[in-house]
């Protein structure tokens, strides 16, 4: 599982549309679909229900989204702290 896949998952969960999510991520739709499919295979969980016109989160996807958001926020905080320490703005 890659951080990129988690970011892609979170954006798709917000947009519920592959085309809009891909545009927001500045990628094309096929790589987004591929990364989401790989994530689902690795987790052995279907995260989204897909139809020709709709994408919806499964119950498992909604539960996973809560943890993914917390994980991504934690990574962002860790990055900010590391940069602050590196620049002498925080304790070591």
What role is predicted for each listed range?
Residues 12-28:
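Short helix-boundary/capping micro-motifs
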Residues 40-57:
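A short LG(V/I)-centered, amphipathic sequence patch enriched
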Residues 42-43, 64-86:
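Alpha-helical linker/hinge and terminal dimerization helices associated
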Residues 36-41, 61:
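N-terminal helix-turn-helix
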Residues 2-8, 29, 61, 68:
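The N-cap/first-turn positions of alpha helices
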Residues 53, 84-92:
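Interdomain hinge and pocket-entrance segments immediately C-terminal to HTH DNA-binding domains
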